[in-house]
Amino acid sequence: MTTVSRDEGKALRADAARNRVRLLECATTLFAERGVETSLDDIARAAGVGIGTLYRHFPTREDLVLAVYGAQIEALDERSRELVASDDPGEALREWMRGFVDFYAVKQGMVTLLRTMMAGSRSEHFEHTRATLQQAAERMLSPAVAAGVIRQDVAAPELLRALGGICLTSDPRTTPASSTLALVDLVYDGLRFGAPVSASRR
């Protein structure tokens, strides 16, 4: 019977972790470029691993999609924690909003499958990620509102819906990034303090 030393075990675990990260990176890129129907063999090949390695980490396509989606949410959350310390909360919010667009460029290729999973047995997973995303948006909005840069009647759910609306109508495969970012800037300008508030919200 072969005995694996502690150092060898650590090396194997580190190698497995690197493979997982690489698979997620390649899946993220290919989902954005081709959609969720992308061949899993192509993803494994791009990551430089065998298909068996992919299935060990992600037994089903749904598992891989969820992992990519979760990684994007975590990245947006982490970015909000970095940006919240900025001396310019308004510009920090704008930068986070632009990062949200990049996230949606990936998610758009997975929308149909994600919606199916949201309504099925994976719905609990999405409640957690939705809460994480809303907390990140609130984290970015609060200091900007407190600094008098952003209107006080803006709420995180509304911001997320506005950004989501932009992204769902801006397919990264056919819409120039500059056009999408221009729309994000228009939304940001509408959020700024001093912008007109509709009569229904006064």
Model-derived regions: residue spans:
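Basic, helix-initiating cap at the start of DNA-binding domains
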Residues: 1-46, 63-66
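Short secondary-structure transition hinges
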Residues: 95, 101-136, 165-173
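C-terminal peripheral helix-coil segments that are non-catalytic and often amphipathic
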Residues: 1-7, 134-135, 139-150, 172-202
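Amphipathic alpha-helical segments enriched in hydrophobic/aromatic and basic residues
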Residues: 31, 39-40, 51, 61, ...
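Short, hydrophobic secondary-structure boundary micro-motifs
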Residues: 39, 110-116, 149, 153-154, ...
